[in-house]
């Protein structure tokens, strides 16, 4: 392991040095205005680091404002304003809610209660397992959901013969990983790429539901169907149910009240915001209302003792929030320097005149297979602003390509390293990489077609 770490460190060092060389070469040889040259050189430097992960993606995100200021592209205040974007606080509220569910064991309680409805029928239990995983991933991190659901699944599968029923094991375990990824598409707080798209296009929580939820509802049964066709699991069996006994107490009841109230306020913010603004005597609706609700959620959760600040702190992925900030700063710098227009015009030159559906297919295939090897959050942070500019240059609705990038970034099903849920189920030792690649490649292709088709029919018009 030490030798592998040393090799990786050596490789990352070489990539970093070459990236610095590339940065200075581009800064001095690009034929555009000095400001645009600086923006493009910065983009190339950050892109190499984000895609190669030669530096941790969060550290790379923190380099964005530092270099933007050093290059004279923005002031310090402008460089850091992205780190206080309302979407960051909305996502923080999502982390707070997820912490409350986890600390009070309501995630397990929900899973156990619904699984009990299967009454020992394996087929029904497996379908419930996938649906619960997808639902919880809409509100919790995909990683935490997959990690929580894996022991529940293994408890059921332990009653089967590992050799004889190997395909059933693979069907269930891959189904959990993929359900977690697909479920994360459903809400704005479900997955970081969703929030990156929303922050670039000023989408609210309820706006996102119109885009993410239909894709989730379409992909979930398609995923289950593909897994079933390929692995032909034996699901006609019965099993004995043994679940952890989690009793209701005042704190759990309070959490059960807080969670739906906050979720429904986000969903119906379009109606609730004017009502509350009127009650407060405000002339206009509260701006970034979803983020204000998210802050209220964190305050209520802490002040009622449902979860402590330390627990929220340790369950919040601060690196992801910093990555949001770096991505938003990069987006603003590219736009202000003219770099995004130059880049967009170059790509438009190659694809101008092509059918919008073909463009959607190409973009979906590009992002889905790219995120098999790169961080989906970093890829979205890098590409969403660029593809918004490309859409504008092509005369397409800017939301179309941005949504294809944002949702496609969550569709990495082929490799264990592609997403944490994939890695978690692969780590069980019951799934071979060849099995994941086989079904994942097919599922990736289905996602390309579904996302491009939905994009063409509803987002690119």
Swiss-Prot record:
Q: Which UniProt keywords apply?
A: Cell membrane, Membrane, Transmembrane, Transmembrane helix, Transport
Name the InterPro entries on file. Na/sul_symport_CS, SLC13A/DASS
Q: Which domain of life is it from?
A: Bacteria
Q: Topology relative to the membrane, per the entry?
A: Multi-pass membrane protein
Question: A cellular component term (GO) from this record?
Answer: plasma membrane
Database matches in PROSITE patterns: NA_SULFATE (PS01271)
Name the predominant localization.
Answer: membrane
Q: Which source organism? A: Haemophilus influenzae (strain ATCC 51907 / DSM 11121 / KW20 / Rd)
Protein name (database record): Uncharacterized transporter HI_0608
Q: Where in the cell is it found?
A: Cell membrane
Q: Which CDD domains match?
A: SLC13_permease (cd01115)
Ranges that cross the membrane: 13-33, 54-74, 81-101, 120-140, 170-190, 211-231, 256-276, 286-306, 314-334, 349-369, 377-397, 399-419, 439-459
Q: Which GO terms describe its biological process?
A: transmembrane transport
Recorded GO MF terms: succinate transmembrane transporter activity; transmembrane transporter activity
Family to which this protein belongs: Belongs to the SLC13A/DASS transporter (TC 2.A.47) family. NADC subfamily.
